[in-house]
Amino acid sequence: MNQNGSQIHSDGNGHSDDTDTPGVSAGQVSVNTAGVDDLLDEIDGLLESNAEEFVRSYVQKGGQ
């Protein structure tokens, strides 16, 4: 135990259990942005081919 009475466990490689692993969350972010990028590419393609129909469809669905 340390001075304040709590325990910190180590994995033997100098890493303690109470630290966050930055690499894990960074990997999740790239997976999420890949889906968003695909959606944006699809919207861009639709706008290039028929912007007027896209706007009409958006307004009919309740957009402003």
From Swiss-Prot:
Keywords: Isopeptide bond, Ubl conjugation pathway. There is a cross-link at Q64 (Isoglutamyl lysine isopeptide (Gln-Lys) (interchain with K-? in acceptor proteins)). GO terms for molecular function: proteasome binding; protein tag activity. GO terms for biological process: modification-dependent protein catabolic process; proteasomal protein catabolic process; protein pupylation. Pathway: Protein degradation; proteasomal Pup-dependent pathway. Residues 1-32 are annotated as: Disordered. Coiled coil: none annotated. Residues 1-10 have a biased composition (Polar residues). The keyword Ion transport does not apply. The modification Deamidated glutamine is found at Q64. Residues 20-58 are annotated as: ARC ATPase binding. InterPro entries: Ubiquitin-like_Pup. Pfam families: Pup. Is modified by deamidation of its C-terminal glutamine to glutamate by the deamidase Dop, a prerequisite to the subsequent pupylation process. Protein modifier that is covalently attached to lysine residues of substrate proteins, thereby targeting them for proteasomal degradation. The tagging system is termed pupylation. The N-terminal unstructured half of Pup provides a signal required to initiate unfolding and degradation by the proteasome but is not needed for pupylation, while the C-terminal helical half of Pup interacts with ARC to target proteins to the proteasome. HAMAP family: Pup. Belongs to the prokaryotic ubiquitin-like protein family. Strongly interacts with the proteasome-associated ATPase ARC through a hydrophobic interface; the interacting region of Pup lies in its C-terminal half. There is one Pup binding site per ARC hexamer ring. This is Prokaryotic ubiquitin-like protein Pup. It comes from Corynebacterium diphtheriae (strain ATCC 700971 / NCTC 13129 / Biotype gravis).
